[in-house]
């Protein structure tokens, strides 16, 4: 399970004042959340090494976590979006949608790239977590625009607009956005390997959906090349699965690739993709499995 950990600067006296107002001692407030010494550091030294701890304390005290943070607002937003992203990777888009609804920030205090990152995740979770295509398109189109040069999140938003059109079965429009996004991606793929792997997978999945298996295989291999080049395991189980599926559809050997995808999905405890991999293996290789057992 991914954890949301970062050292943040806080206003410790806000915690102390709320605790005293509720007539709770440090031991009672800290119980089940953190050590008493950690709480003391929060209240007296304005240091919190785990943002989840701060959230839990604020929930117990019934105060807003934003009121206790003095860190640069962009750092707070980036941390919050990391949590949203972690949920999306596990295909927990409904939870991600609920998480991003809790994020409050002023656009005046954050840079353009971070705003475009927020708009991308807001659009993505509206689409896949709330099934609100109109809201999703609004955020994604805003997220795809830039007056100061493209950011990686502008490109991600373009890619996600492709996903929206794909879900609407408007495949010609989806193809326009997918192709445009991966064209722009060439300038970013090694600098932002995680985001590149996400987009190559999405694009491969689309081409697989419209039965252009050669293109799908090509994009899945592009994603795997980035993963190898940058030593990242991000989206690895998805890319391996997509490669295996399209190899099978092209009547090429695919069992070993499916086994690799299965291994990594199990390792990362990604139950979402694991179900698809197991179903394919059972369907595509049942006869060979039975022969091996004889």
Residue ranges and their predicted role:
Residues 52-67:
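DNA major-groove recognition helix of helix-turn-helix/homeodomain DNA-binding modules
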Residues 100-107, 140-147, 179-189, 221-232, ...:
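Amphipathic alpha-helical segments of tetratricopeptide repeats
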Residues 74, 111-115, 152-154, 192-194, ...:
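Residue signature of alpha-solenoid helical repeat architecture, marking inter-repeat boundaries
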Residues 96, 135-136, 174, 216, ...:
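Single-residue signature of alpha-solenoid repeat helices
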Residues 1-21:
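A short, Lys/Arg-rich alpha-helix, primarily the initiator
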Residues 82, 114-122, 159-160, 167, ...:
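"A position-specific structural signal for the A-helix of alpha-solenoid helical repeats
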Residues 22-41:
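Short alpha-helical DNA-recognition segment
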Residues 78, 117, 156, 196-198, ...:
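Residue register of alpha-helical TPR repeats
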């Amino acid at each position: 399970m991914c954890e949301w950990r970062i050292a943040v600067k806080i206003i410790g006296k806000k915690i102390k004042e709320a605790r005293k107002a509720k007539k709770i001692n440090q031991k009672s407030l800290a119980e089940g959340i953190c050590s008493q010494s950690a709480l003391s550091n929060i209240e007296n030294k304005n240091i919190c090494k785990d943002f989840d701890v701060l959230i839990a304390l604020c929930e117990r005290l019934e105060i807003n976590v934003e009121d206790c943070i003095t860190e640069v607002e962009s750092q707070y937003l980036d941390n919050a979006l990391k949590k949203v992203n972690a949920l999306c990777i596990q295909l927990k888009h409904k939870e991600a949608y609920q998480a991003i609804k809790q994020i409050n920030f002023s656009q005046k205090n954050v840079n353009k790239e971070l705003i475009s990152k927020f708009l991308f995740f807001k659009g993505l979770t509206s689409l896949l977590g709330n099934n609100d295509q109109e809201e999703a398109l609004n955020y994604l189109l805003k997220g795809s625009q830039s007056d100061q040069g493209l950011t990686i999140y502008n490109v991600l938003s373009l890619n996600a607009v492709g996903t929206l059109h794909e879900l609407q079965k408007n495949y010609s429009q989806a193809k326009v956005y997918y192709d445009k996004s991966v064209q722009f991606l060439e300038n970013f793929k090694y600098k932002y390997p995680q985001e590149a792997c996400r987009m190559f997978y999405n694009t491969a999945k689309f081409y697989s959906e419209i039965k252009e298996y050669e293109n799908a295989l090509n994009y899945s291999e592009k994603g795997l090349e980035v993963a190898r080049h940058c030593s990242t395991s991000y989206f690895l189980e998805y890319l391996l699965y997509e490669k295996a599926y399209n190899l099978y559809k092209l009547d090429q050997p695919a069992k070993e690739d499916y086994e690799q995808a299965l291994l990594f999905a199990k390792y990362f405890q990604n139950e979402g993709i694991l179900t698809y991999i197991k179903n394919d293996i059972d369907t595509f290789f049942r006869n060979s499995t039975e022969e091996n057992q004889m």
